[in-house]
């Protein structure tokens, strides 16, 4: 038991020494991370494979090309231009986007319909890129790893006590639960900087959050009437309402460059994009439901509501 305890303490000291040598790519200040950039990239690549296994990628070459080129342009102007950046649109009506370590950024189709201009899309791309450049997921995982190790040290002194958690599970928790208010605020500031570097209107991110708040309020009203679960919104930002207003106010307090918006070009690009569930997942015509993939159809009785 004592030998195991000593080995864990020794491992904790090694982790601490590694963390003290790391510098944050954005701030240049010492960073508490226990994961190297190579490990970060490998983790992102592995997670990307799992996402592709469990998600459907949008089949729209023109829109995907536009989105990827915009993402790559912003990424090349970021604090980590040399990462092998990868931008993916998931064919899902969810209002969300997320980023994983190593340069992987994902947007859901459902989110694209809520942008009013290319500048707003660039703002959210910049925000997700900022989470990667500032190593937010890596920092969160590093803190959790050391915390788990400390708990493990305590568990070692208790007969039968044990604890285990993989980096993959930690990353999954961060992606699903979202980031802390501190990290979201930091990503907002960095995103505003990236918008300026690329000549976009720096109020775009704040304008998008206002739109999403309105959309989320409507979704929640509908959910209440139907007795459905309340939406957490983009990045879970609406799970605690006041923080959203604070983020918008913080972005509006700092000086902004009134750069380009490219509204017309963006709206033309998303024209015809399915809203909500796509026809491939089933659709209604009058009182009949059709599902192309399963090659089935059936009638819905009057007065019934269909949930696909």
Regions found by a protein language model. Give the residues of each.
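Metalloprotease/metallohydrolase-associated module, dominated by Zn2+-dependent proteases
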Residues: 40, 160-204
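A short glycine-threonine-serine/GTX helix/turn-capping micro-motif
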Residues: 34-35, 177-181, 234-242
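Secretory pathway targeting signatures of secreted, lumenal, and periplasmic proteins
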Residues: 297-308
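Peri-catalytic and regulatory segments of divalent metal-dependent proteins
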Residues: 22-152, 190-206, 214-229, 237, ...
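C-terminal motif of bacterial Sec signal peptides marking the signal peptidase cleavage site
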Residues: 17-20
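Membrane-embedded and juxtamembrane structural elements of multi-pass membrane proteins
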Residues: 133-180
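Bacterial N-terminal signal peptides that target proteins for export
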Residues: 1-11
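Short glycine/proline- and charge-enriched loop/turn segments
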Residues: 168-172, 226-232
């Amino acid at each position: 038991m004592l030998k195991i305890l000593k080995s864990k303490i020794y491992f904790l000291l090694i982790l601490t020494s590694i963390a003290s040598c790391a510098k944050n790519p954005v701030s240049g200040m010492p960073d508490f991370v226990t994961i190297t950039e190579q490990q970060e990239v490998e983790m992102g690549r592995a997670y990307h494979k799992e996402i592709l296994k469990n998600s459907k990628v949008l089949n729209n070459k023109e829109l995907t090309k536009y989105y990827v080129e915009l993402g790559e342009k912003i990424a090349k102007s970021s604090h980590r231009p040399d990462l092998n950046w990868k931008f993916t649109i998931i064919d899902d009506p969810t209002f969300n986007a997320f980023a994983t370590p190593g340069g992987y950024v994902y947007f859901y189709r459902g989110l694209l319909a809520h942008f009013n201009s290319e500048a707003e899309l660039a703002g959210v791309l910049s925000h997700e890129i900022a989470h990667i450049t500032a190593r937010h997921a890596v920092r969160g995982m590093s803190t959790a790893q050391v915390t788990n190790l400390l708990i493990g040290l305590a568990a070692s002194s208790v007969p039968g006590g044990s604890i285990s958690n993989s980096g993959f599970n930690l990353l999954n928790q961060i992606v699903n639960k979202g980031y802390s208010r501190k990290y979201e605020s930091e990503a907002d500031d960095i995103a505003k900087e990236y918008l300026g570097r690329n000549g976009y209107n720096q109020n775009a991110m704040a304008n998008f959050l206002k739109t999403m708040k309105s959309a989320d309020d409507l979704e929640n009203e509908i959910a209440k009437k139907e007795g459905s679960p309340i939406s957490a919104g983009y990045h879970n930002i609406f799970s605690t309402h006041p923080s959203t207003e604070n983020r918008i106010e913080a972005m509006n307090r700092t000086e902004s460059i009134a750069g380009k918006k490219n509204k017309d070009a963006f709206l033309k690009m998303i024209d015809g994009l399915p809203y909500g569930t796509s026809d491939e997942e089933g659709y209604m015509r009058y009182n009949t439901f059709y599902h192309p993939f399963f090659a089935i159809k059936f009638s819905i009785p009057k007065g019934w509501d269909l949930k696909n």
